[in-house]
Regions:
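Sec-dependent N-terminal signal peptides of Gram-positive bacterial secreted proteins and lipoproteins
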Residues: 4-24
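Extracytoplasmic cell-surface/polysaccharide-interacting catalytic and binding patches
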Residues: 22-130, 145-244
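Segments that shape or occlude catalytic/ligand-binding pockets
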Residues: 135
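Extracytoplasmic/secreted cell-surface and envelope-processing proteins
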Residues: 138-139
Length: 244
């Protein structure tokens, strides 16, 4: 064979071998990167799953309050309507009585109220709170404006039902929150406010207030005779310090 041809063939073999070696090296590098990326993705996904499990566990293992603890009503009954009249000027005094706008009650009372709400929602209604926990100072303000023990508890007699977080002033509305006929407005100090509904001409209003009354009484509440909207838990709570 021609020596020049031999040299040329040898060069070609060397170049081909070099290209093959380079190709193999490139493939190994690509595979290595791919494996690292896959491992990183898997590790990140595992970390996210672990974090989610921790969050879920924290939520599901949240300690349930004791029955005598004050709680935010809407936390446990999200679909209830709240319009605290004494947090506005829209009440019989014409002045704001307290500053907070959320309803608070004892947890045991809220559990009962949740059952009432469930029962009413099945009938196309919803509860609406006008007043719940009422600070003692607020009771003093109300007495100064309207010192009539038939409608306002005298603070001189100590802590009363609203001050202990087991009493609620409440009405019912349509499920969408729209107003329906009731015997009177809130804090109406006429005969229309009491539970003798014989003087109420509106039959629908009487029917609605009886729906409220039956639902409340069936779930552990008693109504105050002089005010159709006033209900107290049958369980009485001791006075404790609480600031909304």
């Amino acid at each position: 064979m021609n020596s020049r041809l031999i040299k040329t063939f040898a060069v070609i073999v060397i170049i081909a071998a070099g290209m093959t070696a380079c190709g193999q090296k490139k493939n190994v590098t690509t595979d290595d990167v791919s494996e690292k990326e896959t491992a990183n993705i898997q590790e990140t996904a595992a970390q996210e799953v672990t974090a989610q499990k921790i969050i879920t566990q924290e939520i599901t293992t949240e300690k349930e309050p004791e029955d005598d603890e004050y709680v935010l009503v809407k936390k446990y009954i999200p679909d209830i309507y709240v319009e605290l009249r004494y947090a506005t000027e829209n009440n019989f005094t014409g002045v704001k009585i307290y500053d907070f706008t959320e309803a608070y009650l004892r947890y045991g009372t809220v559990k009962k109220l949740a059952q009432v709400q469930k029962e009413l929602k099945q009938q196309g209604y919803s509860l609406k709170i006008w007043d719940a926990y009422r600070p003692f100072e607020a009771q003093q303000k109300l007495w100064e404006v309207y010192p009539d023990p038939n409608y306002v508890a005298n603070p001189a007699n100590g802590m009363r039902r609203h001050n202990l977080g087991g009493t609620v002033d409440i009405t019912i509305v349509a499920a969408d929150g729209s107003i329906i006929p009731m015997p009177s407005e809130f804090d109406d100090f006429s005969l229309k406010a009491d539970r003798n509904y014989s003087d109420i001409d509106n039959e629908e209003a009487v029917n609605n207030v009886m729906i409220l009354q039956n639902a409340m009484e069936n779930n552990g509440f008693t109504g105050y005779q002089g005010e159709w909207w006033d209900y107290s838990d049958t369980v009485e709570y001791e006075a404790v310090d609480f600031e909304p």
